[in-house]
Amino acid sequence: MSVALFVRHGKASAFGSSTDYDQLSPPGVEQSELLGAWLAESGIRADSVFVGPRKRHRQTLDAMAAVLASRGAGLPPATELAELDEHDGIGLVFKLLPELASTDENLQAIVAATVRGESPSPDDVLAAFKRITRRWVKGEIGHAEIEPWSAFRARVARALDRIATLGRGKTALVVTSAGPVAAAVATVLGVDDEEKVLDLSWSAYNASVTELDFTGERWGLRTFNATPHLLDRRLITSV
């Protein structure tokens, strides 16, 4: 039996802010370093490392790796997998926001604030994101320039297939985003209610660990969204 430790990236920049979301915040770096320390103290050694293509994925891995190396538990070179990228729900929101705002007062307020040169509140943007993506995963809306939800689910399944080729008795460290973590769990458990997959992704904490095991052709779930390394409650975040 082998194990895959799926890690959601550390806390990124504020959702909906004018700063680059694809960038770890200082708390995100701290979360990642604490995870590296916990892995070292737990005696967990990765035989293979896979990382998503975003800066926040690589920055999370780098922060973990630095701590592990300082404790004599260096990681092997990482393999970047495009299949571990997050879905582009954020891009979808901005593509469809003007059109959808014509029938949604809450969305109209976000558009109006943007037109005035103001930054909408992160809470308003997050609420809009959730409403729009729920419709997206049900196939009610979409955009030609945005990867369909079904294609996102399929590529995460391909990532699982790639990881499963490692063979028995191996441990893989996988650094990605909340969406792929949730999609991987849903694939393993056979969840086909796509809104529930979204709910799983929204519940994922930054720098959390989800542990999957695999033997032959069968995957199993051991733990989901664990944060044993984050003892300070201020570091329990979901951005």
Task: Give, region by region, the residue ranges found by the protein language model.
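Acidic, low-complexity terminal tails and accessory targeting/binding regions
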Residues: 87-120, 145-146, 150, 165-171, ...
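Phosphate-coordination/substrate-recognition cap region in phosphate-metabolizing enzymes
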Residues: 37-126
